Amino acid sequence: MSKIGLVLEGGGMKCAYTAGILDAMMDNGVTFDYCIGVSAGSANGVSFVAGQRGRNIRFYTEHINEKGYFGLSSFLKTGNLFGLQYIYGTLTNSGGADPLDFDAFMKSPMEYWLVATDAQTGKPTYFSKKDMHKDDYRHVMASCAIPAACRPVEIDGRFYYDGGVSDSIPVQDRKSVV
């Protein structure tokens, strides 16, 4: 039997629009068998799978104005124009200002995948929610780490960049991961 999936592309602020659509889907009980995200779409997907209505849009409308989120201050402190550790660590971890409901994310029957680009090979790597751990969101960081604007993110001894570099709309290879 075929599975029905949701593919969430990246694109930074374009994903603010997607965040509103995802909230409308949650309001109307729309679900999928799986969700696969790339770049900022991977972050939107995590909140959608967890059922956290409103969480995504807060990152694009409220948190974006915070000092550690984006800009010269973040770049000078971390080497990243986007404060990936601030966004997916300080804000997202259990004690953060806008924590991911990791238990709901893991318990959701919806499968979840994200794409990151292997910095050495340039090939896409697909991670599932089974690869993720509470308060360790390096997989999402990796999927969002834009080359030249961010340093690569290390996971298990390998370095990764934004998944959009190698598979910007992960439709063709979805059969290999689902």
Residue ranges and their predicted role:
Residues 1-38, 46-178:
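Patatin-like phospholipase
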